[in-house]
Amino acid sequence: ASNCWSFRTKRPVLFMRATGFSKGVMLTGNNLAGNVTFGIRTELLKKGDKVLSFLPLAHAYGCAFDFLTATAVGTHVTLLGKVPSPKILMKAFEEVKPNLIITVPLVIEKIYKNVIQPIINKKTMKWALSIPLLDGQIYGQIRKKLIDALGGRFKEVIIGGAAMNPEVEEFFHRIKFPFTIGYGMTECAPLISYAPWNEFVPTSSGRVLDIMEARIYKENPDDKLGEIQVRGENVMTGYYKNPEATKEVFTEDGWLRTGDLGTLDDDNNLYIRGRSKTMILSSSGQNIFPEEIEARLNNMPFVLESLVIERNKRLVALVYADYEALDSLGLNQPDNLKTIMDENLKNLNNSVAAYEKVSQIQLYPTEFEKTPKRSIKRYLYNSIAED
């Protein structure tokens, strides 16, 4: 089937880029089939498996694996049809008991914050975890509780679409939770790298697919990081009726510029640090990746989400607080909120490098606007940075 689609472009997939302009991504049948056949060859899903689909099917990630691969194999797909809040997801996982879970970091991090953190933050639990003979048993119990909460039948959780909170990732490795992190983009329909959870290298984004190639382009050979560039079966033909953007995104020798900065090890594992367009250059010449600071801040008490911006050469964190949690504890008062955020700011700055320290936390009145894959539309908040 893939051969007869080789030169036919399917209906363009529209998505929002960081600049705010929509681009139609032209994906061929081969691009889509490359992802589907990879899923079949690696047995991500088997005939008769159950899948809970809660990612937008208009997004390449959900479309390729929750729908195309799932239907090609012959699985039972349950469409959630609701906003995937932790409470709704927990109930759905219990009912469906999926064999594979495909998700984005925001969802899994909320589950960690709501299910796991309340357990490990208890004084008695902290004491027990400090005893070497007990920590292994307790981690095993926590792992079982988390697996049971997600339905108890899945072989692994595949996370992609955005950067994973390093604290959450480290904890999942510590308890030997079966998860892996992949990497992709709509222009690759979407998969670029993936490794099964038992082969996954911590802090990586998986291994480059055998039908893809990746290289790290550095303008200065002495730079530690470079732009990740890819080519192969999954790469789009270009942007719909936009030759200028197409020319800009491809190198002269045919590699796709991802716009992501990172490294590649000898085993073809990709390590991603951040987006070149969101990187902030400090006054001392250091590269600051706001997503890494946000990941730490989002894991702190009563922080629902955050956005780190540069204002007058200083870092400022916009925070949308978890008002529901504050209300439930009777803490939703201005003085309480200020005390909590001051403590969060102190703890945040104690956990980052000197050039990454945040000057202030500014409360934001609403949730940040997001893309279908739940990434914040950063470009909408540039004017706040310039205030």
Label for each model-derived stretch:
Residues T78-L80, V157, M164-G226, N234-T237, ...:
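Conserved ATP-binding loop and adjacent catalytic segment of the adenylate-forming AMP-binding
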Residues V235, N269-N298, A325-N336, V352-V358, ...:
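Adenylate-forming
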